[in-house]
């Protein structure tokens, strides 16, 4: 009986920690994964107002037009930062040419949607 109880007692703290870190209650504990929910939440709430095909065809930037009604959110890939003016401290202040995390998730979702077969 003692042999069966000792492995269970060793696994008990691990199980409790995994339950605490995966808790949906934000007041209990937050794991590092919770920090990345904001872009995903933005995408799930319908923040995407652009079409996937625009990004895969490398369409030119759309001009902002005045639209009556509630303001629309822009595509997450509209704000990719370009190169900045060179300065003498360029090595220390390089900006990443990578798109933002929200843009990467948007492109990944569009890419996966392009593989989806119509029913």
From Swiss-Prot:
PTMs per UniProt: Likely to undergo an endoproteolytic process to form a four-cysteine-containing mature peptide with a canonical CXC chemokine scaffold after secretion.
Compartments, record wording: Secreted
Species this protein is from: Mus musculus (Mouse)
Name the UniProt record assigns to this protein: C-X-C motif chemokine 17
Biased amino acid composition, Basic residues: 82-98
GO annotation terms (biological process): angiogenesis; cell differentiation; chemokine-mediated signaling pathway; macrophage chemotaxis; negative regulation of inflammatory response; positive regulation of cytosolic calcium ion concentration; positive regulation of ERK1 and ERK2 cascade; positive regulation of macrophage chemotaxis
Encoding gene, per UniProt annotation: Cxcl17
Tissue: Detected in lung, trachea, lung, tongue thyroid, submaxillary gland, epididymis, and uterus tissues and at a lower level in ovary, prostate and in intestinal tissues.
Biological role stated in the UniProt entry: Chemokine that acts as a chemoattractant for monocytes, macrophages and dendritic cells. Plays a role in angiogenesis and possibly in the development of tumors. Acts as an anti-inflammatory in the stomach. May play a role in the innate defense against infections. Activates the C-X-C chemokine receptor GPR35 to induce a rapid and transient rise in the level of intracellular calcium ions.
Cystines in this chain: 75-103, 77-110
Family: Belongs to the intercrine alpha (chemokine CxC) family.
Positions of region (Disordered): 75-100
Gene Ontology cellular component terms for the protein in this record: extracellular space
One Gene Ontology MF term: chemokine activity
Reported consequences of knocking out the gene: Mice show no defects in breeding or gross anatomy development, and they gained weight normally but exhibit a paucity of macrophages in the lungs.
Taxonomy of the source species: Eukaryota, Metazoa, Chordata, Craniata, Vertebrata
Entry keywords, A to Z: Angiogenesis, Chemotaxis, Cleavage on pair of basic residues, Developmental protein, Differentiation, Disulfide bond, Secreted, Signal
């Amino acid at each position: 009986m003692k042999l069966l109880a000792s492995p269970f007692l060793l696994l008990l703290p691990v199980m409790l920690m995994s339950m605490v870190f995966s808790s949906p209650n934000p007041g209990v504990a937050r794991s590092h994964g919770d920090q990345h929910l904001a872009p995903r939440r933005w995408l799930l709430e319908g923040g995407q107002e652009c079409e996937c095909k625009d990004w895969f065809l490398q369409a030119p930037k759309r001009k902002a037009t005045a639209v009556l009604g509630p303001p629309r959110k822009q595509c997450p890939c509209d704000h990719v930062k370009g190169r900045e003016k060179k300065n003498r401290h360029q090595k220390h202040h390089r900006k990443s040419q990578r798109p933002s995390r929200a843009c990467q998730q948007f492109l990944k979702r569009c890419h996966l949607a392009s593989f989806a077969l119509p029913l």
